A protein has these predicted regions:
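Electrostatic, structured charged patches in enzyme active sites and in nucleic-acid/phosphate-binding
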Residues: 1-274
Length: 274
């Protein structure tokens, strides 16, 4: 992934703004999707139920990993695009005699994809994950940057992991592609009425797949073919309903659907006036 060059003045301004600092809903990612329009991969902004804020993700791989992490009960906080201290990474590069990322004589601040906090007694209290497509692992420059990042977190005694598309099922990626086109803020005043409607049928007919249920509803209510499936997709994409992202959407049944974070949904309900 390639970002535009960031001047030292801009780096300092972003840090002074509190980017890369905070926790849960107060955390501000060091980089966000508005900062850079030159990304070669699809970026997205998605609401996190654990953090109660919008997350900035720069690829389908990051999105798939985030959705998986956000479902893990033991995880308390997920912070994306977290900056590494520049002086420390420059020193590590000098010690290892490897190049540090630099553009127009300006050292660039490295970032880790996710900093994760969890409360499981069987796991470390926090760990870091770098999400990267495996095709980039053939590039010497990328390998050098990954080693800088790994050494940085090693010095802090924080586990660091590399995550590629080979570590996630193609099914999860297919689900992301199915949902992504509808992953936009929905101001439909009937959203909660739709939720109640479909939740009722998920409970009534738990054995039907979403596609089977949608066909039934389209026929029963004389709706246009595919209309109910589109509405269900919208509710899933916007996370009003949740399901296991590793299970193919064609096999998802009503019993597999969960309602999104209740507190967040109540806030939306109050705002919408329903």
């Amino acid at each position: 992934m390639s970002f535009r060059m960031v001047s030292r003045q801009q780096q300092l301004r972003w840090l002074q703004e509190g980017r890369g600092q905070g926790q849960l809903d107060t955390y501000k990612p060091f980089l966000n999707v508005r900062d850079n329009k030159s990304l070669t991969e699809r970026s997205s902004r998605v609401y996190g139920y654990k953090t109660q804020r919008t997350h900035h993700l720069f690829s389908d791989l990051e999105l798939a990993l985030f959705l998986a992490l956000d479902r893990i009960q033991d995880i308390e906080d997920i912070r994306e695009q977290i900056p590494l201290d520049l002086e420390t990474t420059v020193q590590i590069a000098e010690d290892l005699k490897i190049p540090h990322p630099i553009e127009k004589n300006v050292h660039q601040i490295l970032t880790s994809t996710f900093f994760i906090v969890n409360h499981s007694p069987l796991k470390p209290p926090c760990f870091v994950v770098k999400a990267l497509k495996s095709i980039h692992l053939d590039q010497k420059r990328t390998i050098a940057q990954l080693e800088l990042e790994r050494r940085y977190w090693e010095q802090k005694n924080i586990p660091w992991f590399l995550f590629t598309e080979k570590d996630i099922s193609s099914t999860a990626i297919d689900n992301i592609k199915w949902l992504y086109p509808l992953n936009k803020v929905n101001n439909d005043i009937y959203t909660f009425s739709k939720m109640d409607f479909y939740q009722n049928y998920f409970l009534q007919k738990p054995e039907l797949t979403l596609i089977e249920l949608s066909k039934y509803l389209d026929t029963h209510y004389s709706m246009e073919a595919g209309a109910s499936l589109l509405e269900i997709r919208e509710l899933l994409a916007q996370r009003y309903f949740l399901f296991d992202i590793t299970k193919g959407y064609r096999k998802i049944c009503g019993r597999d659907i969960e309602i999104g974070n209740i507190q967040h949904l109540e806030k939306l309900r109050n705002v919408s006036g329903e």
